[in-house]
């Protein structure tokens, strides 16, 4: 059984395991040439699949290191800032947070993105903390 592990928030990377043994692993920065690459590890993921000679259709599980429930905590913090009398602090947080929230929201569509980008697959997708 193949299992693919991903990190995306910083130092994006992919690792492919078969029956508990590491087959391939790579950081996206090796391909993108961007130190501490932030984003989806497309090239690292493709490298892992190529090293094993498989496609995404052979992968049973994909795990993403991310805790989606943290959004609730961050939203609560933003609302408490709104309630405070310091409107400039709230405005600064909103301006810095919009790109982050947009990237977090896209995490929920990753299974669809992976199927479209890598050609289908019946894998199970897991958020791993």
Residue ranges and their predicted role:
Residues 1-129:
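Short acidic/glycine-rich loops and adjacent helix/strand connectors
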């Amino acid at each position: 059984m193949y299992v693919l592990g991903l990190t995306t928030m910083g130092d994006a990377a992919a690792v492919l395991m078969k029956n508990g043994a590491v087959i391939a692993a790579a950081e996206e920065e090796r391909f993108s040439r961007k130190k501490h690459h932030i984003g989806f590890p497309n090239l690292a993921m493709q490298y892992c699949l190529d090293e094993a000679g498989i496609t995404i259709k052979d992968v049973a599980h994909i795990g993403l290191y991310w805790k989606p429930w943290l959004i609730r905590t961050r939203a609560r913090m933003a609302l408490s800032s709104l309630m405070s009398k310091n409107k400039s602090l709230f405005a600064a947080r909103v301006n810095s947070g919009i790109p982050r929230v947009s990237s977090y929201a896209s995490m929920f569509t990753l299974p669809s993105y992976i199927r479209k980008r890598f050609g289908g697959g019946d894998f199970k997708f897991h958020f791993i903390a």
